[in-house]
Amino acid sequence: MPSRRAARESAPELGALGSSDLSSLSLTVSRTTDELEIIDEYIKENGFGLDGTQLSEMPRLVPRGPASLSSVTLGPAAPPPPATPSWSCTLGRLVSPGPCPRPYLVITEQPKQRGMRFRYECEGRSAGSILGESSTEASKTLPAIELRDCGGLREVEVTACLVWKDWPHRVHPHSLVGKDCTDGVCRVRLRPHVSPRHSFNNLGIQCVRKKEIEAAIERKIQLGIDPYNAGSLKNHQEVDMNVVRICFQASYRDQQGHLHRMDPILSEPVYDKKSTNTSELRICRINKESGPCTGGEELYLLCDKVQKEDISVVFSTASWEGRADFSQADVHRQIAIVFKTPPYEDLEISEPVTVNVFLQRLTDGVCSEPLPFTYLPRDHDSYGVDKKRKRGLPDVLGELSSSDPHGIESKRRKKKPVFLDHFLPGHSSGLFLPPSALQPADSDFFPASISLPGLEPPGGPDLLDDGFAYDPSAPTLFTMLDLLPPAPPLASAVVGSGGAGATVVESSGPEPLSLDSFAAPGPGDVGTASLVGSNMFPNQYREAAFGGGLLSPGPEAT
């Protein structure tokens, strides 16, 4: 328990009170409980300079009656917290700042890697302009840089030159040509406080010939163009003439006039368009856009120039990739490839699946823009047997539901071909043919009369003989013209009564030959005209002629 000694030690702490307060406090020992409560309220009001949290931690006086007042003790008061000096903020402003950030250079727009053609000086034309990486057909962008933390600098000079693609990034023999370019280097001056950004417009690449490589490199090194201090190389055959990098480096002078250089930065590689080893890949056309999922479909692909030993045709989806089957002999003049499609990963697909087909260079992995290709489900009837069977089966339901279920009317409507249609194309149209059309053009090659074996007439006098006498009972000759209907008399033969010869009298004029002028044979007519339009073969005409009594058999041929 706290002793009276502790109460006496705490008494000096109460010296902070006034003299009147000390006298009133000394009387509290012999006073009643009401007076102790008054003292407690007084302490709460004044607080001795302490806040409410500290008062809650101090022991509170409890009224115990007059007999126990002698044992009341007061605990030690906690020291007040140190007050914050009013000049602390002023000292914070007087603290010396740290080292200022060092200015540096960044590339905000990379040059486009592919699509730029390097041109020789002897071509006598502009080398073009390097576009930005985000350039499209609709909007063109340019390579751009930006200076950072250069607010206190008045002027900064930025230098751009060409270096190797790989380490140690030596100076490249090719040169930059265009606006603000001299000696193969582009130099621009920027004022960071005005505009810290700059875009390189009309910046092209001019290539040199192999025999000029060494001289071009030495000339640049003498001008101090070597951002990485890599020096020159004796064996210049290692220089890759088809790819370069653009190195940007900034320099400035401080207030004392000392020259400072920022760290050089490199762009992405820029490839020559005309080189097949580094050019951009592009598919122009494919002859087919779909094929079976089993693969093996032969396709023809047209593209830009590629290397036949460094190209592959890839079919892919998000979870599958297959390569086409072809050899170097299937690459035609670097612009066409004949290949066979690979089988799809799932041969039992029930619906068509669309995949991407693109070109890929094996050395650097560069790919072309993909084109769609559709895999079709497997055809279980590859030889078309089922289709042929279905094609041969009659449409029973269709025939029974029609007005002519047995096809009788359709057969009746079919016109039977006429025999003369094969010889006289104008029969149906009623055209007239002149008599000369039925006469052979060459009488030597096409004889007027044709004798068939076994149908030769008996020998008789020739018509041209002087002693020929007309005999009506003699049998007539059988010719191919007898197969045609009888023609109207073109000429009349009149036999003179007084002479022995026959006199042929021609008609007054040629009469047109028409099929309408022929009289159809009646039921009682029997002759060769009745055979026209029949379906008999030529050897059957003989039997028909002999059986009808039209012809009499002649002597057998020996």
Swiss-Prot record:
Stretch list, region Disordered: 1-21
Keywords recorded for this protein, A-Z: Activator, Biological rhythms, Cytoplasm, Cytoskeleton, Nucleus, Phosphoprotein, Repressor, Transcription, Transcription regulation
Protein location: Nucleus; Cytoplasm, Cytoskeleton, Microtubule organizing center, Centrosome
SMART domains xrefs: IPT (SM00429)
Ranges spanned by the short sequence motif Nuclear localization signal, renumbered to the chain: 387-391, 411-416
GO biological process: antigen processing and presentation; cellular response to osmotic stress; circadian regulation of gene expression; myeloid dendritic cell differentiation; negative regulation of DNA-templated transcription; negative regulation of interferon-beta production; non-canonical NF-kappaB signal transduction; T-helper 1 cell differentiation
SUPFAM superfamilies for this protein: E set domains, p53-like transcription factors
Bias-annotated ranges (Basic and acidic residues): 1-11
Post-translational modification: Phosphorylation at 'Thr-103' and 'Ser-573' is followed by proteasomal degradation.
Entries under PROSITE patterns matching the protein: REL_1, REL_2
UniProt key word Nucleus: yes
Function: NF-kappa-B is a pleiotropic transcription factor which is present in almost all cell types and is involved in many biological processed such as inflammation, immunity, differentiation, cell growth, tumorigenesis and apoptosis. NF-kappa-B is a homo- or heterodimeric complex formed by the Rel-like domain-containing proteins RELA/p65, RELB, NFKB1/p105, NFKB1/p50, REL and NFKB2/p52. The dimers bind at kappa-B sites in the DNA of their target genes and the individual dimers have distinct preferences for different kappa-B sites that they can bind with distinguishable affinity and specificity.
UniProt protein name: Transcription factor RelB
Provenance organism: Mus musculus
